[in-house]
């Protein structure tokens, strides 16, 4: 045995499985302004104490490994380790706890959501000591936020670019989402924009398929944008989906969109990845393009109540990575979204400072230190009868996006767009006059339909449509 080995053995080095709570559960720790704070919903395996479960999360998502290693002595683990500093039981749930973990900022690369997530929501989610694990919220410190560009432009700059103020923006996803030729697709875009919408949108899975290659779609949509602008006198846009199989191909599509002179492109930020998304956001700021973000795949991550990650965390990550719009659910349509919880992360997208409010799912006070805001996009199973509720819930700084609620109009796409625009203008006017949209919404829509045959037809078609299913989990 070498002298060095003998020395190590003599001071108590011992192989074996670690008891994490001895080093990583530190209830006496006072968090720093520079720490990233995380709130995890922890479900330990039977027989695992909550303190050990919380400590294992802190360890496995920072400096820990399952046994003592010689190289622990070559660095300051106390400086770099994550710490579980508080644990509380979840009310009404058996064997579930909220474990609060603080991470020193040195653990994370500047300006990289990819690196932050690789640590905090990485291998620890498969740890055997835990039956389930869910990241409920993150507090991003000011020092780390300042290493990100964030959204390419933000809410105010977008309004200035579009010259549109005092109301939500209106959009429409072109349907059917797959199968149209580029020319027919462009025709649908033109009809919707001419009818009064601000934007139309590629569906998230429209990339470059055999029936419609991306370059053809971009050209026909650009023609539709410019023709509708000339006829209406309003600035129009279509979310051209630049998502591709490689970052290089994605950037090629964004460059072509800029060369065409269109105002906005789109990215599927979860399936495309945060590295690609951040690269595209930087390009969009440098080249004057707005960036619309779709959240395809989010429900795989956030729908389970005790495992995965809440969408408010994905929303915060998107604001760091960059996007001017992001889909946020509707509260009233076909996709899941509880009102208070949804409005909680909508505020985290838009506002510069958001106070802790557990009733809305906000575990930490978040200061965005003037990082530009993101417009929430309400989309999924909505129609004209939802307009008062959507206007009241989301306010002016939002995009209300009707796919089937535009293209399903019995008279065609342009009348469907007219119906939505008339309904929106009626709701905004009524709100500005002091009327209660929540209580008088249906009456406001009926009054407007008396002088808009397009709206009257839409009201008749969708008067019985609801998406109401009992929650089973």
Curated annotation (Swiss-Prot):
It catalyses: 2 (2R)-3-phosphoglycerate + 2 H(+) = D-ribulose 1,5-bisphosphate + CO2 + H2O; D-ribulose 1,5-bisphosphate + O2 = 2-phosphoglycolate + (2R)-3-phosphoglycerate + 2 H(+). It comes from the Eukaryota. The active site is at 175 (proton acceptor), 294 (proton acceptor). Mg(2+) binds at residues 201, 203-204. GO terms for molecular function: magnesium ion binding; monooxygenase activity; ribulose-bisphosphate carboxylase activity. Its main location: plastid. The modification N6,N6,N6-trimethyllysine is found at residue 14. The modification N6-carboxylysine is found at residue 201. The keyword Secreted does not apply. Its EC number is 4.1.1.39. GO terms for biological process: photorespiration; reductive pentose-phosphate cycle. Binds 1 Mg(2+) ion per subunit. Keywords: Acetylation, Calvin cycle, Carbon dioxide fixation, Chloroplast, Disulfide bond, Lyase, Magnesium, Metal-binding, Methylation, Monooxygenase, Oxidoreductase, Photorespiration, Photosynthesis, Plastid. The disulfide bond which can form in the large chain dimeric partners within the hexadecamer appears to be associated with oxidative stress and protein turnover. Its cofactor is Mg(2+). GO terms for cellular component: chloroplast. It holds the Pfam family RuBisCO_large. It is found in: Plastid, Chloroplast. The basic functional RuBisCO is composed of a large chain homodimer in a 'head-to-tail' conformation. In form I RuBisCO this homodimer is arranged in a barrel-like tetramer with the small subunits forming a tetrameric 'cap' on each end of the 'barrel'. Heterohexadecamer of 8 large chains and 8 small chains; disulfide-linked. The disulfide link is formed within the large subunit homodimers. Belongs to the RuBisCO large chain family. Type I subfamily. PANTHER family: RIBULOSE BISPHOSPHATE CARBOXYLASE, RIBULOSE BISPHOSPHATE CARBOXYLASE LARGE CHAIN. RuBisCO catalyzes two reactions: the carboxylation of D-ribulose 1,5-bisphosphate, the primary event in carbon dioxide fixation, as well as the oxidative fragmentation of the pentose substrate in the photorespiration process. Both reactions occur simultaneously and in competition at the same active site. This is Ribulose bisphosphate carboxylase large chain. It comes from Vigna unguiculata (Cowpea).
């Amino acid at each position: 045995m070498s002298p060095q080995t003998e020395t190590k053995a003599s001071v108590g080095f011992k192989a074996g499985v670690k008891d994490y709570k001895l080093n990583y559960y530190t209830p006496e720790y006072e968090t720093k302004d520079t720490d990233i704070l995380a709130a995890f919903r922890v479900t330990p395996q039977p027989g695992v104490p909550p303190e050990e479960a919380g400590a294992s999360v802190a360890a496995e998502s920072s400096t820990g490994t399952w046994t003592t290693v010689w190289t622990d002595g070559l660095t300051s683990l106390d400086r770099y380790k994550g710490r579980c500093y508080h644990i509380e039981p979840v009310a009404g749930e058996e064997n579930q706890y909220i474990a609060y973990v603080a991470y020193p900022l040195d653990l994370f690369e500047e300006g990289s959501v990819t690196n932050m997530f690789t640590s905090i929501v990485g291998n620890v989610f498969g740890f055997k000591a835990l039956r389930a694990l869910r990241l409920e919220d993150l507090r991003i410190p000011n020092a780390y936020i300042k290493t990100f560009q964030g959204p390419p432009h933000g809410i105010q700059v977008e309004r200035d670019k579009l010259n549109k103020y005092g109301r939500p923006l209106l959009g429409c996803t072109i349907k059917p989402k797959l199968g149209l030729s580029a020319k027919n697709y462009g025709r649908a875009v033109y009809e919707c924009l001419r009818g009064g919408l601000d934007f139309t949108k590629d569906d998230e899975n429209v990339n470059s398929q055999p029936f419609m290659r991306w370059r053809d779609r971009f050209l026909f949509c650009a023609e539709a944008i410019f023709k509708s602008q000339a006829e209406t006198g309003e600035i129009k846009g279509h979310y051209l989906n630049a998502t591709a199989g490689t970052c290089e191909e994605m950037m090629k599509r964004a460059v072509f969109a800029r060369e065409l002179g269109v105002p906005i492109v789109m990215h599927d930020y979860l399936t495309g990845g945060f590295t690609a998304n951040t690269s595209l956001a930087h390009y969009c700021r440098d080249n004057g393009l707005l960036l619309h973000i779709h959240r395809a795949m989010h429900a795989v991550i956030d729908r389970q109540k005790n495992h995965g990650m809440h969408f408010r965390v994905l929303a915060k990550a998107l604001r760091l990575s960059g996007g001017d719009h992001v889909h946020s659910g509707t509260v009233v349509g076909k996709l899941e979204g509880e009102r208070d919880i949804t409005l909680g992360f909508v505020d985290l997208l838009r506002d510069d400072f958001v106070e802790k409010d557990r009733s809305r799912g906000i575990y930490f006070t978040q200061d965005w230190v003037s990082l530009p805001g993101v417009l929430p996009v309400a989309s999924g199973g909505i129609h004209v009868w939802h307009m008062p509720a959507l206007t009241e819930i989301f306010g002016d700084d939002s995009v209300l996006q009707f796919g089937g609620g535009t293209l399903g109009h019995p008279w065609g796409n342009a009348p469907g767009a007219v119906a939505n625009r008339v309904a929106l203008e009626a709701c905004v006017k009524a709100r500005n006059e002091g009327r209660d949209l929540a209580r008088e919404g249906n009456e406001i829509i009926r009054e407007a339909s008396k002088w808009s045959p397009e709206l009257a037809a839409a009201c008749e078609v969708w008067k019985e449509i609801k998406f109401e299913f009992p929650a089973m989990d």
